[in-house]
Amino acid sequence: MHKTPLEISLKANPDQKIPWRCAVCGFVFTGEKPPKGCPVCHSPSYEFIPEKDRQQLTYNGEKFDIMLINGSSHRAGNTGYMADLAEAVLRERGVSYRRFNLSEYVIDYCWCCYAVRAESCAYPCRNKKDDMPAFHAMLAASKAVIIVSPINWNGMSARLKVFLDRTTCMENLFHINKPGLTEGKVAGILVQGHEDGAIKTAMDIWLNFQQLGYVLAPFGIAFRTHGSHFNSVTDREFFQNDELIVRHTRGVVNNVIETMQLDIGEKLKGKLVPVTE
């Protein structure tokens, strides 16, 4: 598994007292190690990351294959576990990728410039103060994206919804007669949750990428739920001992890679007719 900022810091400075921030609610604790749990939101210790002065996310322009995005508010929870499974396949297949846990980044709400006039919503996005400009650039540079999402009230997390809202400036390129940056790219969607809403969540996510011109990999959606009759505290053990979530996650990632390697984007360049909302 990849090393988290928490693990890297602990290895480098095992006895140093530093501030630890809960990536879920923002509570800050100072100590050699993070607390056993967050007293505010009750998240476990693995949701804490070393607190440091915020630096805006940047992108160096280096091309890579796949963006892997954990859209949960819990960076190391059940959605994080599903993302870990996906990341393992990416490493095994030797494709270049970048993983992002959205809870570790600052993404502002969409300003809805399009509501003023279509031309006001343009790329690059007018909001250049948060981390989204780098994400925009990486969506344009990568060949595929794999979204991993929890189910919150029969839908995606609010954090992921804000991220997808902020891609409006890329979708709107088609409406203001400018070349698109995402058509023909490949998407895969992974969803997990305590109970109902998996298919709806996946379809809501897919609609966004469909409007950006992405191609869904064959068998490109997988989901796994536990059940409303169980206490959610048992979900973690269930998922980590479940063979189906492993098999289906690995399958989707494999299918994304195989579809990406067909180079569909290049073959379709200049041949597509944008039809978007």
Annotate each PLM feature.
Residues 226-239:
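Short helix/strand-capping connector loops at secondary-structure junctions
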Residues 33-45:
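Cysteine-rich micro-motifs
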Residues 176-222:
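Short, glycine-/small-residue-rich phosphate/pyrophosphate-handling segment
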Residues 33-36, 80-81, 158-162, 200-203:
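Generic recognition of short, well-ordered alpha-helical segments
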Residues 16-18, 34, 103-106, 183:
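Short metal-coordination and nucleic-acid-contact micro-motifs, chiefly zinc-binding Cys/His arrays
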Residues 4-14, 26-27, 42, 50-177, ...:
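N-terminal beta1-alpha1-beta2 submodule of the flavodoxin-like/Rossmannoid cofactor-binding fold
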Residues 21, 37, 109:
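The −1 position to Zn-ligating cysteines in a subset of zinc-ribbon hairpins
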Residues 21-31:
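Short Cys/His-rich zinc-binding micro-motifs
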